[in-house]
Design a protein with these regions (language model features):
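PLP-dependent amino-acid enzyme catalytic core
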Residues: 1-405
């Protein structure tokens, strides 16, 4: 049986299986680190990503039939971006290669494996987009009745991406934070396991990204990892992954973790700048980065604590900077990611300009969390440069356009 811990209160004797929060202080719960045995190793001969790292996950058995082939996403060298910034080792971890085109599949895969092992029949999630599609897909794969709650007014693309998998799809009026809280009580009364953003098993799944980066860099840790930040569960999962590697003696230097928010909704970056231990709820401003616009991040205080303990960094970038970074990643490196993902490159530029990153200091990994194909509507008003030629003038026209003509 798994044991749990709270960063503030310590180990718990028992836990409400329908709540991810500590009953004492209301902060998120984690799988207890002290309960993990030493001598864990990576099984590189295994095909499935979660099987490779099974020693580090709270799963007694992994059913391959529940997997959609998530994980082992490419770590792509960003040579042109690096040269433009005067930085040698820049990589993009392309999470768009996961089954539903985002990093969420890593957490969902582990959470669903656990749910099935416990005999769960009903699962659900509260989401603004990526997690809706992911939970619906894995619920369909496992044959579970799946409930997806989205905030009223969610984009048609978000609704359609989840609806194709056949879940009980519900649009709910009201505040997203209130919906998150309400889902937990409703789930307990109706027997629905809501595997929301800070579900402890979901966060365990996010550790696998850290393990993959370690292998893909030749069994070493990067100097820095830059990751978009919303609820905090993804970032904390990554941090726990590197902590596991450190605990097993597989890495000697813990990477600097940089969390990035949108300036229009940056409660954690603002709290970090002020040196606060707890974030202050804010009224969300306007931003195109809806997937990371969370004014009440449920793991926010845990993120602030871990940033202090691990010398991490939080910052916010503008919509203009993230859109410019999105275009640069696409045109320079062939990687089309969501604007939220491109916050990582925008943050990298900010750190370079401030002298916080210099050439020769080690590798930097940008976590590109999702595909730009999920947010095509944001490009609808972007100008298109299209050249028009008649067939008899095509060759001459192409010659004029060619950089090598």
């Amino acid at each position: 049986m798994d044991t749990f811990e709270c960063l503030s209160c310590g180990p718990l004797a028992s836990r409400d299986p329908y709540s991810p929060f500590c009953p004492g202080c209301g902060e998120p719960l984690f799988i207890a680190s002290a309960a993990c045995p030493g001598g864990r190793r990576i099984h590189e001969d295994k095909a499935l990503a979660i099987a490779k790292f099974a020693d580090f996950l709270p799963l007694e058995h992994i059913d391959p039939a529940l997997s959609l082939g998530e994980g082992m996403t490419p770590l792509v060298p960003l040579g042109r971006v690096g040269r433009a910034l005067g930085l040698a080792e820049i990589y993009g971890k392309n999470e768009a290669q996961n089954p539903t085109w985002s990093f969420k599949d890593r957490g969902t895969a582990v959470a669903v494996q656990k749910a099935v092992s416990l005999g769960t029949q009903r699962i659900g999630t509260v989401s603004t987009g990526n997690m809706a599609a992911s939970t619906a897909a894995y619920g369909a794969r496992a044959g579970l009745e799946t409930f997806v709650l989205l905030k009223e007014g969610s984009s048609a693309a978000s609704l359609q991406a989840a609806a194709i998998f056949g879940p009980r799809l519900v649009a709910v009026e009201g505040d997203y934070g209130a919906l998150f809280e309400a889902s937990l009580g409703i789930g307990k009364r109706l027997g629905i396991t809501f595997m929301n953003s800070i579900d402890p098993y979901r966060m365990e799944g996010y550790k696998v990204t850290a393990f993959e980066i370690f292998l893909q860099l030749g069994r070493r840790a990067p100097r820095s990892v830059i990751v978009p930040l919303s609820s905090g569960g993804h970032l904390l999962g990554l941090m726990r992954g590197f902590a596991d590697l450190e605990r097993e003696g597989l890495i000697q230097t813990y990477p600097q973790i940089v969390g990035v928010q949108a300036e229009g909704c940056a409660p954690l970056a603002q709290a970090f700048d002020k040196g606060l231990a707890k974030y202050e709820r804010i009224a969300p401003g306007r931003t195109i980065a809806h997937a990371i616009a969370n004014p009440t991040p449920p793991a926010g205080n845990a993120v602030l604590r871990m940033m202090r303990e691990r010398d991490g960094l939080l910052l916010a970038v503008s919509d203009e900077d993230m859109l410019e970074a999105q275009r640069e990643l696409a045109s320079s490196e062939g990687l089309f990611c969501q604007p939220e993902s491109a916050t990582t490159l925008a943050a990298l530029k900010r750190l370079r300009d401030a002298g916080r990153l210099r050439a020769g200091e080690g590798s930097v990994v940008l976590i590109l969390t999702g595909s730009g194909l999920k947010t095509l509507h944001l490009l609808a008003s972007a100008p298109l440069e299209i050249h028009h030629f008649a067939i008899d003038g095509l060759e001459a026209g192409l010659a004029r356009l060619s950089k090598r003509a």
